[in-house]
Amino acid sequence: APGVRRPVLRTEPRGERLEIGLADPGFADVNGRVDLKDANVLVIDGTGVTMRELMIPISRHQPLVLVARGMDEDVLATLVANRKSLTMPLAAVITDLIPEVADLTGALPVSVADLRAGYLPAGHLGHATRWITDGARTWIEPHPPLVGTT
């Protein structure tokens, strides 16, 4: 009808866009993406992480995004199965853009050896107001800075 204002549809999510896709399409929802609000971000420094090292972070810090340079296929398959069967708010991405993700989320990369030893201080986790990843891109909406910190 004339004079009726229509809402503007946003074609891209808000936040910083990076060329990072999902580590496995099984993490995606029916729309082909993961959309997590108030996500915790675990940046893993190194490769070779196993499910044993990931069980505590996954159980304690949901929703959780795992960010690593590489991850074994069996680990990814188990993560996808947990996401689907237990409806866990969980995603994994494989990327070399570790410093960029750490900077945007405030994460401190954690070594596989530290995870193996059970060492994961809460302050090492990054955070995002919203984390959206599809097959090829990620949008990270950082948490607003705390009042009084500059």
Enumerate the language-model features and the residues they cover.
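Core, soluble structural subunits of large cytosolic macromolecular machines
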Residues: 1-150
